From Swiss-Prot:
Bias (Polar residues): 623-632
Keywords: Allergen, Disulfide bond, Seed storage protein, Signal, Storage protein
Signal listed as a keyword: yes
Compositional bias (Acidic residues): 314-323
Task performed by this protein: Sulfur-rich seed storage protein. This protein found in the seeds of many leguminous and non-leguminous plants is the source of sulfur-containing amino acids in seed meals.
Signal peptide: 1-22
Originating species: Lupinus angustifolius
Protein name (Swiss-Prot/TrEMBL): Conglutin alpha 2
Disulfide bond annotation, renumbered to this chain: C31-C64, C107-C464
Biased segments, Basic and acidic residues type: 228-237, 298-313, 324-333, 357-369, 634-643
PROSITE patterns, per database record: 11S_SEED_STORAGE
Secreted among keywords: no
Family to which the UniProt record says this protein belongs: Belongs to the 11S seed storage protein (globulins) family.
Domain (Cupin type-1): residue spans on this chain: 36-261, 470-616
């Protein structure tokens, strides 16, 4: 009986292991890349106010990194409609400037319109208006943040946000979508939930996967759902409100049916990005100050030109009349000034001499008084000491015998007290040691409670007040700098704490002409490079020592560099700027040059078969940092291209 049970149990284990191993090879093969490719956008959606471009998330490189990408180009006065995703996002502003608004549930609306004064209005109209109508006129919303070129923006999952281009130039932003984040409870397919508008599908590969799943569904319920969804797609309903029952929404939102009809059936032209014809007026300190300045300018410009001309003519006439008078006054004053100045100088000298004499007399009197007081004090002290010694001698003669007896008793009492104190001190020492241990344990427990409380803070201390922006393109922000090669600046959970929740970070690299970013690898993260400006040569080598990428990268292209793959960059004649997104909030790199410097010379000599002088040259020649400048611009120091 035991053998059949063991046999059946082993079969079950084999089946389970085969099922598990059937899924694992697919995940492992995603990063077994023999060749990397420079990726360009695969899908393009044109809207009234801009363009949205996406990369196919089924690309092997992107599946290895577990991310997806979007690129939004918003024209002036363009509004990217409110939307949210089920995974965190990192947005880098490549060009332009704009406004960002997020709507976090549970956070207060801190921006409010000022109450309009109703003193000038008719009291009959005021009485006819209800309080609800007055509240509708006064808008309030959550904080609006302004961004510009070089900013990194962190968007939490499930939080709706919108962007608006208030500048005169186009706004270009690249979005990293961390689809494999632990915060994503759905599958890693990229998807975006639009609250408004009639947006087109940004990731067709996701729609294709959903279509295949519908075909595999069985039963009448699945067929009915598929038909219902097909009807909705034919009607063009793609926002999250279009699928609800209109009557249910009217009751839930407590609004008219006309409003619900507008929400569920938007205009076909309202896609991802719409154009605001008259501009967007929102509550913000910046816009309010600009409006006040604009209101003051027309008032000043509205003054009649004739009045200004008359005032200028009157000023010129007054100046002409005042010129001869001012000259006569100046001549008279110049004639009188020498005598007055001499008289004033004489008076000042007399006053100074008198004040000096008075001061000297006061000093002499003060010295005399102090000497007299000191002499009196010394004599009094000597007399007091003599009297006190006489009294002590007389008292000591009469009390000598009594003190001898009392001293003996006091000595015995002191010995007994000392013995008791020793015993008490020993007990206290033991007790104090125990108390210290207990206090240390309590302190450790309190620290643990504080850490738990910090990690469990409410919305008011995390999302509502979290900092979402950080500019990493400023030259003063550089973490590594070589004036002949370029600069590198990083943003991570230490500089932007919200990234600790996202488990993401980024590096901004700006290489000057022919500047070199020496070979290095990412220790604990995958890296995705997006070129923002210029052109450069990039080489990537895998664990087998094979070159998986050796080509030029230009503006607008993506390149995935897997973890621990060695990579090197060199800029062209136009320079080379790129943003490198990392899948770790504290991503670290390891330059090969620093590794050589950390290894003893004997080890390197035996490992590479070098002489000691060659090893010292390998370790200590050139720059210490990863940014290297070529020796001369006349020679060609570009990275060689391997066929």
């Amino acid at each position: 009986m035991a053998k059949p049970c063991l046999f059946s149990f082993s079969l079950c284990l084999l089946l389970l292991s085969s099922l598990c191993l059937a899924e694992r090879p697919e995940r492992y093969k995603e990063c077994q890349l023999d060749r990397l490719n420079a990726l360009e956008p695969d899908n393009r959606v044109e809207s009234e106010g801009g363009v949205t471009e996406t990369w196919n998330s089924n690309r092997p490189e992107l599946r290895c990194a577990g991310v997806a990408f979007e690129k939004h180009t918003i024209q002036p006065q363009g509004l990217h409609l409110p939307s949210y995703t089920n995974y965190p996002q990192l947005i880098f502003i490549v060009e332009g400037e704009g406004a960002l608004g997020i709507s976090v549930p549970g956070c207060t609306e801190t921006y409010e319109e000022a109450q309009q004064s109703q003193s000038s209005q008719d009291p009959r109209r005021r009485s006819s208006r209800s309080q609800s109508q007055e509240q509708e006129q006064q808008d309030s919303h959550q904080k609006i943040q302004y961004f510009r070129e070089g900013d990194i923006i962190a968007i939490p999952p499930g939080i709706p946000y919108w962007t608006y281009n208030y500048g005169e130039q186009r706004l270009v932003a690249i979005n990293l979508l961390d689809t494999t984040s632990l915060l994503n409870q759905l599958d890693p397919s990229p998807r975006r939930f639009y609250i408004a508008g009639n947006p087109e599908e940004e990731h067709p590969e996701t729609q294709e996967q959903q279509g295949q799943q519908r075909e595999q569904q069985q039963g009448a319920g699945g067929r009915r759902r598929g038909k219902h969804q097909q009807e909705q797609e034919e009607e063009g309903k793609n926002n999250v409100l279009s699928g609800f029952d209109p009557q249910f929404l009217t009751q839930a939102f407590n609004v008219d049916e006309e409003i619900i009809n507008r929400l569920q059936n938007p205009d076909e032209r309202l896609k991802q990005i719409v154009r605001v014809k008259r501009g967007l007026s929102i509550i913000s300190p910046k816009s309010q100050e600009e409006e006040e300045e604009e209101e003051e300018e027309p008032r000043q410009r509205g003054q009649p030109e004739r009045r200004e001309e008359r005032r200028e003519e009157e000023k010129e006439e007054e100046e002409e009349e005042d010129e001869p008078r001012s000259r006569e006054r100046y001549e008279r004053q110049s004639r009188r000034r020498p005598g007055r100045q001499q008289g004033r100088q004489g008076e000042e000298q007399e006053e100074e001499s008198e004040s000096e004499q008075e001061g000297r007399g006061q000093q002499r009197e003060w010295e005399r008084t102090t000497r007299h007081r000191r002499a009196q004090g010394e004599e009094g002290e000597e007399e007091e000491e003599e009297t006190s010694t006489r009294v002590r001698r007389q008292q000591g003669r009469g009390r000598g015998q009594e003190q001898g007896q009392e001293q003996g008793q006091e000595q015995e009492q002191e010995e007994e007290q000392q013995e008791g104190r020793r015993g008490r001190h020993g007990g206290r020492g033991r007790r104090s040691g125990q108390q210290r241990e207990e206090e240390e344990e309590e302190q450790q427990q309190q620290q643990g409670r504080r850490k738990r409380q910090e990690s469990r803070n409410g919305l008011e201390e995390t999302i509502c007040t979290a900092r979402l922006l950080e500019n990493i393109a400023k030259p003063s922000r550089a973490d590594l700098y070589n004036p002949n090669a370029g600069r590198i600046s990083s943003v991570n959970s230490l500089t932007l704490p919200i990234l600790r929740w996202f488990q993401l970070s980024a590096d901004y690299v700006n290489l000057y002409r022919n500047g070199i970013y020496a070979p290095h690898w990412n220790i604990n993260a995958n890296s995705v490079i997006f070129v923002t400006r210029g052109r450069g040569r990039v080489q990537v080598v895998n664990c087998q020592g094979n070159s998986v990428f050796n080509d030029d990268l230009r503006r607008g292209q993506l390149l995935v560099v897997p973890q621990n793959f060695v990579v090197a960059h060199q800029a062209g004649d136009e320079g080379f700027e790129f943003i490198a997104f990392k899948t770790n909030d504290l991503a670290a790199t390891s330059p090969v040059k620093q590794v050589f410097r950390g290894i003893p010379a004997e080890v390197l000599a035996n490992a590479f078969g070098l002489r000691l002088n060659q090893v010292s040259q390998l370790k200590y020649s050139g720059n210490q940092g990863p940014l290297v400048s070529p020796q001369s611009e006349s020679e060609d120091h570009t990275l060689p291209k391997v066929a």
